[in-house]
Amino acid sequence: MFETNYLAGGRLDPPFHPTKTEPFIPGFIMDSFSFQTNETTYTLPADMELYAISVSASIYELDDKWSLIVNGQTVCQDIYTKRIPEGMHFMVYKAVAAGSTITFRFHNQGILDKTVWFELHFLR
């Protein structure tokens, strides 16, 4: 027997389905220096839901990796770069309040300085 637990025309519960509807994708560029860890911090201007990140670099070296930290909680830890730009979609929509901080950290393990681009994908 099949039983419906949601009203027709209703919505599914978060965090697996969003509560916000408008896309907002800020882009960032940063320099990353040889054998250093560099980071950029973004403060949210409004309540939003984070659902993905896109990362690209001017040069890819074997041990380069990145991390994403939301309000001190690590969401992505030591993700090694690939030879192409990448996007990572989360399995949930992470609610993040206005004034919260999101830190992108790039660990340049190579001998070359590089430029790193990343975008944070939100709904607001």
Regions found by a protein language model. Give the residues of each.
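Beta-strand-centric surfaces of beta-sandwich/beta-rich domains
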Residues: 1-124
